[in-house]
Amino acid sequence: MDGAENSSSPPHTASEDGCGTFSSSGELGGVVLVESLGSAEKIILRWDSTVSEEARDKMIFSGDRLEVDRYLQAVDHIQNSLRSVSLSSPTPNPDTTTTTTIQIAMARLEDEFRTILLSSSTPVDAESLLVDTPRSNSNSRSSDHFSAAVAAAAEADGSSRGGGSGSGGGGGSFMRSMRLSTSIREIDLIGEDAVADLRSIAERMIAAGYLRECVQVYGSVRKSSVDASFRNLGIEKLSIGDIQRLEWDALENKIRHWIKAAKVCIRTLFASEKRLSELIFEGLSSSSAVTPPLQPLFSLSSPSRSYSFSSSYSEACFLETVKGPAIQLFNFAEAISISRRSPEKLFKILDLHDALADLLPDIDVVFESKAAESIRVQAAEILSRLAEAARGILSEFENAVLREPSKVPVPGGTIHPLTRYVMNYISLISDYKQTLIELIVSKPSSSSNSRYSGELSVPDFDFTELQEDRTTLALHLIWVIVILEFNLEAKSQHYRDTSLAHFFMMNNVHYIVQKIKGTPELREMIGDEYLRKLTGKYRIAATNYQRATWVRVLNCLRDEGLHVKGSFSSGVSKSLLRERFKSFNSIFEEVHRVQATWLVPDTQLREELRISIAEKLLPAYRSFLGRFRSHIESGRHPEQYIKYSWEDLDTAVLDLFEGNPATQHLRRRSQG
């Protein structure tokens, strides 16, 4: 035998002559030459695993490279012979032995192809890839490295591995537009030597008419590898129904993980699979194969299974590998896009929308062929449905704010949970401003329309009063605040105490104002003009509260009705004055007792309100006390009527609006 005997040398057969294994072959400068059709057939038959146990136990491509070259040259020799027959006769009738031999060779090459793929395929390392990298830095593989891989494959095509069938290497066509995408991060899925071997086998199988078998083997093995990578990435096989039956809390976590995994799948896993299929199959052609009437003789299957592609072989193999996984990946996003709409889903749906929108250019690059159009269309349709879901959820949110049914008054007139929820919600909406400005294109309507039941009253609001440069999103946010106020006004009517109703509105509108001021993006959209209107509203509510509460207190400190005129004298009626002091004490004590339990959560507003009350109450009481104290103190038991100094009242005001019962009853603490 030429070359040293080793474990991968072919078994000897009865057809060999005594001169050795390759009596009809020779070597020239280290390149093995197969000199005749007969010697080529012998080489093929010696590796027939159906008749030789030794051939079954050994793989050609795992052994001596000279043996690999001999086998591939033998295949080329037989294929060239068949081609010559087909070209020399209008009705070719190739030798049966030759066609049987090529069938044996193709079966062997199919096994070799599968074995190389299996031994070289490993799932991606999820831990290293599930790390977000900036788009500008995400293409970790340089174009030089890729060019070297292409050159290696092309060089192999020019050697005895690939040159025999005359197919062009097509290396230059590998440099597709995806190499220019800064977000694509391709990795080497299989080593360069294995890629070269796979390409040399694929070239011969395709030339012999075994395209379908080659594609099926490739797709089967690589799809298993992709499936394993999916498992490593935590991508579950869930149907759309399975996903829609999950609780939203569980889905939120899955959405968060899906976004990370989808970036890896599109930009690395699928892109790398596309590159691998190009390295192996791009530029291969069946043009050098025998003519169509002879092709069925070379197929292990029936003629009806002949494979035809409108796209390139590399694209066919790529889609055979990833189309199923890609559909599985997108099914998750599709299930979310068509799930039941509710306000709490908006932000995760927007996260999903933004992630898919960001991936769409990469999807268009990775799945650029006509054959992959369905995947591009599916992704675009899901994106459209997510956008529609976001619009629908915002509409549902507006409706929910208007309809919120709670009628139980909030204790102490503090901030209603609905107010906190709505303002936190629209503050989060402002974080997605850029996306929602693109998605929300129709203006809100303050008139009754199809969104609202005819039985439900809707606030009137003239949007034309606002500045014209408002985005439609800004108008919707203002509309949400309008209907929130409208609902709060209705809720305030459930307070029996009118002053508490005003106090409630003051607290809630003030919270709305402060939330807008504290969220720059929200403030920019709402605008200072509308913010001033809201500020005016809570101040009016504060004024109305003070009037409803403190006017009746201050009325006790007026002079009217205290002066009397008689036939013998004129002056102050002590009995009326005593009643006036008693009324003041009683009313103020009741206000103090009740309103100490009322709550103003905002420290600054609470202090401003106390100061405003003190500025009205204390001067009036001090003046009243100065004018009439002597009349009370000249009588009996003056302490029953003048119970408090103005300092006592000043201290008592500080007990108000803490949300707790007064720590002690009012009592005289000082003597003015």
Please give the residue ranges for each predicted region:
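Non-transmembrane, amphipathic alpha-helical segments
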Residues: 25-32, 36, 56-70, 90-101, ...
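Eukaryotic N-terminal, low-complexity and coiled-coil-prone scaffolding/targeting segments
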Residues: 1-332, 343-354, 650-672
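Short, flexible helical or helix-coil boundary motifs
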Residues: 44, 51, 116, 120, ...
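Extended, charged coiled-coil "stalk/tether" helices of large eukaryotic trafficking and scaffold proteins
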Residues: 5-26, 487-496, 500, 509-512, ...
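Extended alpha-helical solenoid scaffold regions that build the rod-like backbones
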Residues: 243-526, 620-624
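Alpha-helical interaction elements in eukaryotic regulators
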Residues: 29, 36, 67, 71-74, ...
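Flexible helix-coil junctions and inter-repeat linker/turn elements that act as hinges
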Residues: 49, 53, 81-92, 115-122, ...
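Short coil/turn segments at secondary-structure boundaries
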Residues: 216-220, 229, 442, 527, ...
